[in-house]
């Protein structure tokens, strides 16, 4: 099957800088999952995957600013069969002084098992995060344990086998999917050129232009550019 990807975007918030970067730099079909809770958006994305037949599906959070270089890098490696799951990577957050955090979203440590009586991972249960400078210094492909929904891409068959879901706490869907990828022995890859700017402010959730519970949830399909001015 020819490489025919689609970008699925979570949109619990209206973050114009992130939205505009996707519209300006990525010319593939897009689906905006607007104003859903995290459990709801997982269910809606799974439904979309089941009911369509794209070759690859890309999961994107709502708070990442994607450059053309990052988008092109991710699509280039996603098309290669040897990389089962490919993901962009991010700064963990932005510090109060406006600088990027020291650490990235890349981790090569083992994701520990979440016990049945636990509702989801605590921050101290994640393996160590690698410094941004280390990631930038790497010239080749990088193994990571976290497909952190920074344009995380895989073939349709992988998503059908491992549907998207949250932990019982209704959060941490990227950790949940990454843990199940690890259990199945499916490797996740990234590259230094796949950097996506993460707009999160510190460790707490960024309640910026929150849509959930304020507007009606909807799924919006957007095709490839016909008249680019329509999107930019």
Residue locations for each model-derived region?
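Short beta-strand-to-loop acidic/aromatic patch adjacent to the donor-nucleotide binding site
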Residues: 55-65
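N-proximal low-complexity "stem/linker" segments adjacent to membrane-targeting elements
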Residues: 1-33
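Conserved catalytic core of nucleotide-sugar-dependent glycosyltransferases
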Residues: 67-168
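Short, high-confidence coil segments that cap the C-terminus of an alpha-helix
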Residues: 54, 82-84, 186
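Active-site-proximal specificity loops/subdomain of glycosyltransferases
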Residues: 27-54
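A short acidic, amphipathic alpha-helical/loop segment
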Residues: 21, 44-47, 70-74
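C-terminal catalytic/acceptor-binding lobe
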Residues: 147, 156, 161-232
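Short beta-strand/turn micro-motifs composed of small residues
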Residues: 9-11, 60, 192
């Amino acid at each position: 099957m020819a490489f025919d990807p689609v970008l699925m975007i979570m949109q619990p918030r209206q973050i114009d800088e992130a939205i505009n970067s996707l519209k300006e730099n990525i010319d593939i079909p897009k689906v905006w999952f607007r104003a859903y809770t995290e459990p709801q958006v997982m269910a809606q994305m799974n439904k979309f995957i089941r009911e369509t037949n794209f070759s690859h599906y890309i999961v994107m959070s709502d708070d990442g600013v994607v450059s053309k270089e990052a988008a092109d890098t991710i699509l280039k490696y996603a098309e290669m069969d040897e990389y089962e799951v490919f993901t962009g990577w991010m700064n963990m957050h932005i510090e109060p002084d406006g600088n990027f955090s020291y650490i990235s979203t890349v981790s090569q440590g083992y994701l520990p098992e979440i016990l049945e009586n636990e509702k989801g991972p605590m921050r101290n249960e994640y393996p160590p995060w690698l410094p941004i400078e280390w990631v930038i210094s790497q010239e080749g492909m990088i193994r990571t344990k976290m497909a952190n929904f920074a344009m995380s891409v895989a073939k349709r068959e992988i998503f059908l086998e491992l549907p998207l879901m949250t932990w019982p706490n209704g959060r941490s869907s990227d950790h949940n999917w990454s843990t199940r990828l690890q259990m199945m022995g499916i490797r996740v890859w990234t590259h230094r050129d796949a950097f996506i700017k993460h707009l999160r402010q510190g460790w707490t959730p960024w309640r910026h232009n929150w849509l959930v519970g304020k507007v009606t949830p909807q799924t919006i399909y957007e095709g490839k550019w016909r008249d680019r001015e329509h999107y930019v």
